[in-house]
Amino acid sequence: MIEVIFLGTGGIKPTPERNVPSIAIKVEGELILFDVGEGTLRQMEIAGLSPMKIRRIFITHFHGDHYLGLPALIQTMNLWKRKEPLHIYGPENSIEFIKNLLNSGYFAPSFDVTVHELPGKARLQFEKYEVWAFEVSHGVPALGYVFKEKDRRGSFDLEKIKNLGLEPGPWMKELEEKKVINIGGRTIRLSEVTGPKKRGAKIVYTGDTEPCENVIQFSRRANLLIHEATYLNSEDRGESYHTTVEEACEIWKKSKAFNLALFHRGPRYSFKEYKEGATKLCPQAMIPRDFDRIMVKGAEYVIFKVR
């Protein structure tokens, strides 16, 4: 089970209703953060999430509302005597920008902070999941991210076991660990006695972007597309390089992702006003508030939990 926790659903600046962007993905006790707007540490405290559980942080771009929460987060980790390395990923110039942040004030972390600059397209492999980076269109170097849970092996198939003249037993645990074993002089492979692989969850986070073909391509058949929708309509669009609700809904439909969540709401809207307007334009979309959670299990289902 993967848990997506919305720590900040607003954009540009905090409002009394919501904080600026940060999304946590919780998988088997590990926390991965996508963007760290100012105040993210406080949001984590309210959500009951420990900064010490964070192993990786992915920054979409270097506008303040997406990264200015980093110093407070890292200094708190240091105060709590963190020893485990922290890995931060982002677009070009990440090393310079984060180095400048860490050099400000009377502070130096006692643990390793490693910054990885990602090209416009990257695929990172970790033990239980992958993260893919792709370029979006925001007027500055900016990335969207795909979180992809690794596919899991299929269940043991008793019919296949029987057809090989075998009976269920302790050898199954050994086979699960080693993938290939020898029974009675015969080589048995795990793939011979299990069913089809179970597809892992796929979650896409766009960060800030105007309508972008890359989002459609990388969101193909995702369980969940988290797309920015700063404006309810094009008449409200002040600056460029952002998306309206209607545009985000159209991108979602083209991508054939199964579920859509809209975030990065402009500060001009109350939640009530935004939800009413967005629901008329895209009735199927989820409109999360800060601290709402979405539970994703494999490729099977998505549950939206309101705080």
Swiss-Prot record:
Cofactors demanded by this protein: Zn(2+)
Keywords in alphabetical order: Endonuclease, Hydrolase, Metal-binding, Nuclease, tRNA processing, Zinc
Parts forming coiled coils: none
Free-text cofactor note: Binds 2 Zn(2+) ions.
Lineage summary: Archaea, Methanobacteriati, Methanobacteriota, Thermococci, Thermococcales
Assembly behavior: Homodimer.
Family: Belongs to the RNase Z family.
A GO molecular-function annotation: 3'-tRNA processing endoribonuclease activity
Active site: 65
Catalytic function, reaction form: Endonucleolytic cleavage of RNA, removing extra 3' nucleotides from tRNA precursor, generating 3' termini of tRNAs. A 3'-hydroxy group is left at the tRNA terminus and a 5'-phosphoryl group is left at the trailer molecule
Positions that bind Zn(2+) 2: 65-66, 208, 264
The protein, known as: Ribonuclease Z
InterPro entries for this protein: Metallo-B-lactamas, RibonucZ/Hydroxyglut_hydro, RNase_Z/BN
Record keyword Aminoacyl-tRNA synthetase present: no
EC number(s) recorded for this UniProt protein: 3.1.26.11
Species: Pyrococcus abyssi (strain GE5 / Orsay)
Pfam families assigned to the protein according to its UniProt record, in alphabetical order: Lactamase_B (PF00753)
Superkingdom field: Archaea
Function: Zinc phosphodiesterase, which displays some tRNA 3'-processing endonuclease activity. Probably involved in tRNA maturation, by removing a 3'-trailer from precursor tRNA.
Binding site for Zn(2+) 1: 61, 63, 138, 208
